[in-house]
């Protein structure tokens, strides 16, 4: 029987001494409290420069899992795109130039779609504004912005400022206008809720929506009047001078999100010839360009293609003939597979994967336990089987329930996770294995913004825990660690040499 090394990633579980609406600190967590007292622990960085993001930028699930799995600081798309804009090479990008040239050659429209937000998690509005300026410089006559609204990585009702900026820029350049708005709940689903994606797609492509208004600001105001915050704005079309905008053959569409997981579904609706998740009027003959690669199967141009890192944790385990398991529920499954493997879709030899479906509820505060019971059942069975040298799992609760802004539900989620951790601890210790518990970023550690006294639905920049649970004696060797130090630590406890590509350092020293 193999002695399993288990990495538990508690998504959105940040550390804060403050008890002000801190769902993690204020929840009843007897198992967590005892582990925190009994076993070696430290706090590590999961945001900003330490994970390859701009200074003070909060971390996120994609970035976190890439850094953990690669064992090095991986500079993120946000940083790369910011650099291209700063160095004035953004407008020279071949894919972007081809999309603009297509619209000019065909005297057709250029559509920009994406999350209009300063959040910096899935997109950044400054990238959209820069693209608008470049389009004007290169001779585009008609540009239409289809704005997805955030309210999740930003305050729930904060889109007005972004819409006003976009409106002013388009007006100043006499270039076009915001042609549709919708909450990211619809356009950026990642859990096969195609009914939501269909509403967003129809508003963008067919100008078919439940609501039509004269301006994006009016659409936002009316949405607030219906008590729908930014994230949940029902797809709405904007009518200017009696004209509704549709996406037509020979148009160019540039998707301005840089993060893949929530951009895939609607991209497939635009590009797949045999798409069958909902009816489309026709398969459009358009130039579809994405800022980064969302899915290798998508038929589209990519402005900033991925760089595939070598010797990630998964690859090193394979080369050392170790068996590994990745497990998560739907919401975080891409993170423990695709992102953890540095953007690689294919499984490594000896790598098994278990996907547990996320519950079909409108928002996860309605079911704070999500699919944690099923994830835990599978994990305990895998540990007991003695089949795996290394298991990587993700619990989505503290992030996904944290994003709802529901403090009571977030505490319930944390308390349920505490029960799950108790089961994992018992199984690991019984089989003389090793368990590491960490997080990819913070979230549920601040459920209300202390400055505004309003719900805080975004991630935090707080440090995250890193705990060792096992029978080995361990000492903290690195006081100021970061996510990229986790993989080297796992290799250390497993007795596997760290490859030179992994620049992280081991956080704990283990007695031989």
Swiss-Prot record:
Transmembrane segments: none annotated. Binds 2 manganese ions per subunit. One of its GO terms (biological process) is glucose catabolic process. SUPFAM superfamilies: 2,3-Bisphosphoglycerate-independent phosphoglycerate mutase, substrate-binding domain (SSF64158), Alkaline phosphatase-like (SSF53649). It catalyses: (2R)-2-phosphoglycerate = (2R)-3-phosphoglycerate. The active site is at residue 61. This is 2,3-bisphosphoglycerate-independent phosphoglycerate mutase. It comes from Francisella tularensis subsp. tularensis (strain SCHU S4 / Schu 4). The gene is gpmI.
């Amino acid at each position: 029987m193999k002695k399993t090394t288990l990495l538990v990633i508690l998504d959105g579980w940040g550390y804060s001494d403050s008890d002000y609406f801190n769902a993690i600190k204020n929840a009843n967590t007897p198992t967590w409290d005892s582990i925190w007292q009994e076993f070696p622990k430290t706090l590590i960085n999961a945001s900003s420069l330490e994970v390859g993001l701009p200074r003070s930028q909060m971390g996120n699930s994609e970035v976190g899992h890439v850094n953990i799995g690669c064992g090095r600081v991986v500079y993120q798309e946000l940083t790369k795109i910011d650099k291209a804009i700063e160095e004035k090479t953004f407008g020279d990008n071949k894919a972007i130039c081809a999309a603009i040239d297509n619209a000019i050659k065909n005297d057709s429209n250029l559509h920009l779609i994406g999350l209009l937000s300063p959040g910096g998690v899935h997109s950044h509005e400054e990238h959209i504004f820069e693209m608008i300026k470049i389009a004007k410089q290169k001779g585009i006559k008609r540009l239409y912005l289809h704005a997805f609204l955030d309210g999740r990585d930003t305050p729930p009702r904060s889109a007005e400022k972004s819409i006003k900026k976009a409106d002013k820029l388009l007006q100043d350049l006499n270039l076009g206008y915001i042609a549709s708005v919708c909450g990211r709940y619809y356009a950026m689903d990642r859990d096969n809720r195609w009914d939501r994606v269909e509403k967003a797609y129809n508003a963008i492509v067919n100008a078919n929506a439940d609501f039509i208004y004269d301006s994006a600001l009016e659409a936002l105001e009316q949405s607030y009047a219906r008590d729908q915050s930014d994230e949940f704005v029902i797809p709405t079309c904007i009518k200017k001078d009696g004209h509704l905008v549709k996406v037509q053959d020979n148009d160019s569409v540039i998707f301005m999100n840089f993060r893949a997981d929530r951009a895939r579904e609607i991209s497939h609706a635009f590009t797949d010839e045999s798409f069958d998740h909902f009816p489309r009027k026709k398969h459009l003959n358009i130039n579809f360009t994405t800022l980064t690669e969302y899915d290798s199967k998508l038929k589209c141009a990519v402005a900033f293609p991925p760089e595939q890192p070598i010797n990630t944790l998964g690859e090193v385990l394979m080369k050392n003939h170790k068996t590994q398991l990745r497990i998560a529920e739907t919401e975080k499954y891409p993170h423990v597979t695709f992102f953890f493997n540095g953007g690689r879709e294919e499984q490594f030899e000896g790598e098994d994967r278990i996907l547990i479906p996320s519950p079909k509820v409108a928002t996860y505060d309605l079911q704070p336990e999500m699919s944690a019971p099923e994830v835990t059942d599978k994990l305990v069975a895998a540990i007991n089987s003695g089949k795996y040298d290394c298991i990587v799992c993700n619990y989505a609760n503290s992030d996904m329930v944290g994003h709802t802004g529901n403090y009571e539900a977030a505490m319930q989620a944390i308390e349920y996770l505490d029960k799950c951790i108790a089961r994992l601890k018992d199984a690991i210790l019984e089989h003389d294995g090793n368990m590491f518990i960490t997080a990819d970023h913070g979230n549920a550690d601040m459920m209300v913004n202390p400055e505004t006294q309003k719900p805080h639905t975004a991630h935090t920049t707080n440090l995250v825990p890193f705990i060792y649970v096992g029978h080995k004696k361990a000492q903290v060797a690195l006081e100021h660690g970061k996510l990229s130090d986790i993989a080297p630590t796992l290799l250390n406890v497993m007795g596997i040499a760290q490859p030179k590509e992994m620049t992280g350092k081991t956080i704990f020293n283990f007695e031989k």
